[in-house]
């Protein structure tokens, strides 16, 4: 069975990642319609990837009876609206992370999913990388007691990687975008900001940037952190907001039965600068073993995701191993798993309920920063 896909949003993540990946997964998916706020961009993608229908009307995609799965690849502020509409139309939904930017908006999505025959799959691709699900989780499981963990993501400008990806992205001409689009975008964003920072009558630009950062780069790291460390953060001990760099210290309960009731600390550090380097990793420390996973830019297909293990061997010597579970990229693995979920009923790991835990963590971070009373 091949699933018919309708795509809403033909920007960077569509052109560089999802359209090529879906095309190569032609035994699982067939793209039958694509929508973008810029009709010429949608038409370009339709021509390049042999998609029958191009439109500027997202609801034409959502209500098309031939569409099995709606991909929502728009900017964050439209995620909730289109996801809910697609669920109301009975569609399965693949929504790129973040699910949305506020807890109330996430609850609206959850309510819509509960009354729909459709299901929602949230696009946290790092959690589907074979080296994460294979070597990393296997090696971490052999650590008797986790003592500390570190989450780091220092990213250079996306354009550096996109321009060398061989995908030749086309960007919209401003004159092709309706004048009302910016007003609608601002309206949706302001509503989400009010929900994300309840009781605060003065949502500053710094608060808005923090919210957008956690929804973009931060959501990758913090979602991965939650799965790797086996649960929900116990507490947020401190945060630093210094745009465009952000950091935090979390406390986690020990996942080990032998250390029940004990806790350990996790540091999170992330930011975006102009250095063309992508340093994203998660490292977990035990008393005699360290395990880390290193991610590279997802915009260049097939860059290896490696696991590094440092330990003391039976001779008392330092031993270092590097493991690569597969060269298969995380997006291919993710969409292969999504097919199993939608067609064969497999449980969705990156579900709406799971994504809500990220938003709850952001809420706790906002409170620690003094942004919510």
State what each model feature region is.
Residues 123-130, 161-233:
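Mid-domain beta-loop-alpha active-site segment that forms a flexible
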Residues 29-33, 68-70, 212:
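Short active-site oxyanion
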Residues 148, 196-197, 201-299, 325-346, ...:
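Contiguous beta-strand/loop segments that form the cofactor/metal-binding neighborhood of enzyme cores
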Residues 69-71, 118, 253-259, 337-373:
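C-terminal helix-rich "cap/oligomerization" subdomain common to oxidoreductases
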Residues 95-96, 120-122, 293:
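Hydrophobic residues in well-ordered beta-strands that form the structural core
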Residues 49-112:
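Beta-loop-alpha module in the N-terminal Rossmann-like domain of NAD(P)-dependent dehydrogenases
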Residues 100-187:
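A contiguous active-site-proximal alpha/beta segment in oxidoreductase catalytic domains
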